Design a protein with these regions (language model features):
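Structural detector of well-ordered beta-strand residues that form the stable sheet scaffold
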Residues: 23, 44, 101-102, 133, ...
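Nucleotide-sugar donor-binding loop of glycosyltransferases
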Residues: 20, 26-28, 47-49, 105, ...
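Short, conserved catalytic or interaction motifs in soluble domains
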Residues: 48, 138, 166
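Short, well-ordered alpha-helices that flank and scaffold nucleotide-derived cofactor binding pockets
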Residues: 12, 34, 38, 62, ...
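Phosphate-binding glycine-rich loop
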Residues: 1-21, 35-39, 45-47, 116
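Short acidic capping loops at alpha-helix termini that bridge into adjacent secondary structure
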Residues: 18-21, 71, 159-160
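PLP-dependent aminotransferase class I/II
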Residues: 58, 74-78, 83-90, 96, ...
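Active-site phosphate-binding strand-loop segment of PLP-dependent enzymes
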Residues: 51-144, 149-157
Length: 266
């Protein structure tokens, strides 16, 4: 099991089907778009904001405004490097065009933005996005060796994902088509074996108590990097707005001669 599996069942729960058009950022790992292709959907890439590396909301509005409403079913938004979207603004756009939001927060556990009410909106809380996915890959903030998680506040999406992750099988009495003893279960959908083991789950939960501290350590390292690079005009360090708390899975810099720097560091 992994975040790719979580993205897949999230797309299934959202109802992505053959021919559906979905918007995605090109600045991500393949799974963010492939989860739509797994379901037969079509992916339309929309360019990023060069400061945040997130899907550019102005370009998004431009594309949506030139297409008939209903052309696009949803959007996959990736909190790249740990920088959270202002989901409140994207939610307004999604609602205007009748779209759902699948948030790929694999880089961003613990990240948040401040919304118009002054509330800290953490990635995964579900206030504005329909489903959020996290990764427990070895290099992520929390690891289970390999694994992923999908979060939602929507009961319908939750029940669908719970079914899809376990072969489409249920033991829940109220959902069974007949009563035939406590041993009885039914396969009601074509599902998958998308479950991490109990040992992996225990490994992951054991890290929760230090999850916030781990983000703080990353942010302190970023502060030191920024101080070290402040006098080097050739290096552009990561941007962070005042209303954002960046989780810094990655420390992304921009330079004029990327290949030259790469070869030098080798």
């Amino acid at each position: 099991c992994n975040a790719t599996a979580a993205l897949h069942i999230a797309a299934m729960a959202l109802g992505v089907k053959e021919g559906d058009n979905v918007i995605c950022t090109p600045m991500t790992f393949a799974s963010s778009a492939n989860c739509i292709r797994f379901c037969g959907g079509n992916v339309r890439f929309v360019d990023i904001d060069p400061e945040t590396y997130l899907l550019d909301i102005n370009k998004l509005k431009e594309i949506l405004s030139t297409a008939p409403k209903g052309t696009y079913k949803g959007m996959v938004l990736v909190d790249f490097a740990g920088y959270p979207h202002n989901m409140e603004e994207y939610r307004k756009v999604a609602d205007e065009y009748g779209m759902w939001i699948l948030e790929d927060a694999c880089h961003a556990p613990g990240a948040y933005f401040i919304d118009s009410t002054g509330e800290r909106v953490y990635c995964g809380c579900g206030k504005y996005s329909d489903i959020t996915v996290f990764s427990f890959h070895p290099v992520k903030h929390i690891t289970t060796g390999e694994g992923g998680m999908a979060c939602t506040q929507n009961k319908e999406y939750y029940e669908k994902m719970a079914l899809y992750r376990t072969h489409g099988i249920t033991h829940e009495a109220e959902k069974l088509q007949r009563e035939d003893g406590l041993w009885y279960y039914e396969m009601q959908e074509l599902g998958y074996n998308y479950r991490i083991t109990d040992i992996q789950a225990a490994l992951g939960t054991s890290q929760l108590k230090r999850a916030r501290k781990n983000v703080e350590i990353r942010r302190e390292l970023v502060r030191k990097y920024n101080e070290a690079f402040v006098s080097i005009s050739e290096i552009k360090t990561p941007y962070e707005a005042a209303d954002v708390y960046h989780a810094y899975h990655l420390y992304v810099i921009q330079v004029e001669d990327r290949l030259g720097l790469y070869n030098f560091l080798r």
